[in-house]
Structures are given as structure tokens and as C-alpha cells.
Amino acid sequence: MLLTRQYIDKAFWKKLIAIGVPVSLQSMLFSLLGAIDIFMVSQLGEAATAAVGVGNRIFFFNLAVVFGLCGAVTVLASQYYGSGNLSGIRRTLAQSWFISLVVTLPFIWLYVVYDKEIVSFMADDPEYVGYAREYLVVTGLSLLGTAVVVPIESVLRSVGEAKMPTYVSIAAIVVNVFLNAVLIFGLLGFPQWGVFGAAVGTFISRFFQTGVLVYFFCRRYSHLLPTLSDWREGTVKKYRNKYFKVSMPMLIHDALWTGGLIVYSIIYGQLGVTELAIISFLSPIEGVLISTFMGFAVAASVLLGNDIGAQQYDRVEKTAWWYVLTSAVLATILFFAVWICSPLILNLLEKSPLTDKQMALNVCLVLALGMILRVFNMVGIGGVLKSGADIRYSIFIDTFGQWAIGIPLTYYTGMVLGLPLHWVLMSLLVEELVKGILTTHRIQSKRWINNMVDDDTSVTA
């Protein structure tokens, strides 16, 4: 199980940093944007805070669906790149673009036509519903850009180019923060639109990101743009089945997982608008902390996928544990840092519009504690198991942990026992513990290592 030092050399660190750091930075900035949005909107009250939080959860659900559909890009393109097959990368990108757009369009229609019904599932407070509807309709339209961006980002990372998506994301985030501040509060002579202004700012920034990324991708990586023959090959049964063999299980996995997150939001909403506002306020902050480790998961998926494609199986077995254990140790250090800084955090919460400051601090500490297990599982499942296309067992781990343990415990502790929010969240650690045990067993078994491209002819142009 333990790796030898022969594989952790200068070249390894160079690749890890080149992929992991930009991805973590991009993920952190994306989460930080959510935190800034929530902080700005929180000045309008708890109903507005809850509305934007729910809207972001719904957007995250669709983002995860697109990621699931494009999961085959990361798995297959990484292995194609390791085997030197560029035509396979182009074909996979064509397939992911087509499928992402086909699946995303019906969701956009639902969010525009049935906006009231959707947001009312979370809570029925009239002020909250009004805010949530206008936020969902506008941001829902921006999902079209997401369906274009995610496949490109997946391909670029699979070939070791993680900087370009990060730079573009940074620019988009700067645009988003500026527009949100201007349109929420009516600065520089613009109208004061409140929650609607936050939605408009998000909409514009996402299409700004789409346009800039497509432009640079076409200029610098034109050799990875699908040709007409690549689009045709993507419809061939052999390649179509290979793509769906990876992407459909990942779609089911991500849809069930994020669907579970929405169920959690519904339960929190039934506890009260205050509890929903606390979760909406703190979840983006938790996301910023967890996203610092996202680079480990993506780097593990890409680099292990490259090694599997190159059939370097001894290296794969020994470096897999390094990713998982190192990230878990770092997450533990981060938890203690949050715990030590709890007086400072409470002082900052005093300046927030949240009414129950002590509950918010307790929730913050529980979320920080849960990061240790969440990071372990994120890297183990989303990084290691994903690199070997072990999708079905990944689905089992996440689905069983969430729907058989996490959701029932949340409902029982919150709705039946009526425990405070922080104790409800504490019960969720049982879910993460069970998932961690299952992940450990699977990695040790080595049955997650599957070479999906060894039957393809190597093509370099």
C-alpha cells in the first residue's frame, strides 16, 4: 500500500503543481465568488441570502450533471493523451459538447417555466420565493455557457494545460464581482436591483468566460478542435458505447449526489429560514476551504489516467495512496487552524446579518471537522477511482452513503428529534465515515485500475 520514493521525483512534483495548483486556485476562486455573492446579498436580509443560496445549489446540480456527462472527457482524454492518441481526444470532445447541450436545454426550459414550483420546494416564505424566482430564471439561462465551457476545461486539463482555464476564470470572477457590486447596490449610476442584480451579473460573467475561453482554445489548441470526421466518428457504435460506458454512470453518480444536496437543502428549509440562511451563508466558505484540495483530486485523476494509458501500473498502485493520504493530512491541519481561530470567526459573524451567531459558529466548526473525511473521499473517489474508470463502484459508495445513511439521518435528527442545526450536520459525518471505509477497501483491492484505451490505435494527428 505504501509507495516507494522512486516515483515522487522532480518530474512528478512539476506535473502535480502544473495541474493541481491552477485547478485548486480556480476552484477556490469559484467558491470565493459564491461567498462574495452571499455576503453582498446578505445585506438585504435572511430571505435574500436563502434565495441566492438555493439558486446556487440548483446551479451546482446542473454543473454536476454537465461534469458527469463530461467525466468521460477527463477519463478517456487523459488515457488517450498518455497513449499518444490525439484523434481520440478530439472525438471525445465532440461527443461531450453534443451531449452536454442536449441535456442542458430541457433544464433551462424547466427553470424558466416552472421557477415558482421549483423554489417553493425548499421553503414557502413569500419573500424568499420572490427573490429565488428572479434569481433562478436569469442564472438558469447561463447554463448554456456552462455546457460549452466544461468540456473544453476537461480536455485542457487532460493534456496538462490547467493554466488557461484558471486565468479565464479569474477574469470572469473579477467581472462578476464588479457587476454584482454595481447592480446589487446601484453603484456608478446603475439601478439598484438587489437579488436580480446579482443574477444579471452572474449571467454576464458566465458568457464572458465562455467567449474568452473558446477564443483562446481555438487560437492555441486548434489541433484539439474536432474535425468533421471526428464528429462522425463520435457517432460510430464502438466509440459511442465507449463514451457512454464511462459518462452515463458518472452522470447518474453526479446527478444522484447533487440531487441529495438539494434534498438536504429542502430539509434545512423546513427547519426554518434562519437555518437555511446559515447554511447558505457558510456553505460557500466551506467550499473555499475544500476547493484548496480540488487540485489533488483533478491531478490524481489526470496523472493516474496518463499512467494507466501508458500501462505503468506499478506506478499507479503506489502513487494513488500518496494523493489520498497527503490531502487528508493537510485537511486535518486546516481543521485545527479553523478551531484555533474560532474566536475571530465569531467576531466576524457578529458583523453578519445572521440572527443566531452562536449556531452559525457551531455549524462552521462542524463543517471544518467534516472536511477531513470529505477531502479523503473527494480525492479517493473523484481522483483515484475516477482515473481508472471505476465509475460503478464510485456510484455505489456515494449513493449508498448519501441516500441510505446521510439523508435518513438528517431527516431523523432534524425533523423528528428537532435537534439544532449543528447536531444535524454532525450526524452527516457518519455518512462520510462509511464512504471513507468503502473507498479505502476499494483502493486496496486494485480492482479500480481499468485501461479504457488499450484497444485503440495510436494516432498523433
Q: Each predicted region: which residue ranges?
A:
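Short alpha-helical transmembrane segments in multi-pass integral membrane proteins
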Residues: 1-20, 77-144, 191-247, 304-370, ...
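Transmembrane helical elements of multi-pass membrane transporters/channels
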Residues: 18-37, 138, 149, 172, ...
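Transmembrane alpha-helix boundary and packing residues in multipass membrane permease domains
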Residues: 23, 27, 38-39, 75, ...
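Generic alpha-helical transmembrane segments of integral inner-membrane proteins
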Residues: 24, 28, 32, 36, ...
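Helix-terminus/linker motif at the lipid-water interface of multi-pass membrane proteins
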Residues: 28, 32-50, 119-126, 182-193, ...
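Small-residue-rich hydrophobic transmembrane alpha-helices
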Residues: 38, 49-109, 146-165, 276-342, ...
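Short runs within selected transmembrane alpha-helices of multi-pass transporters and secretion channels
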Residues: 70, 139-158, 165-173, 198-213, ...
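Short loop-to-helix capping motifs
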Residues: 125, 161-162, 272, 390-391, ...
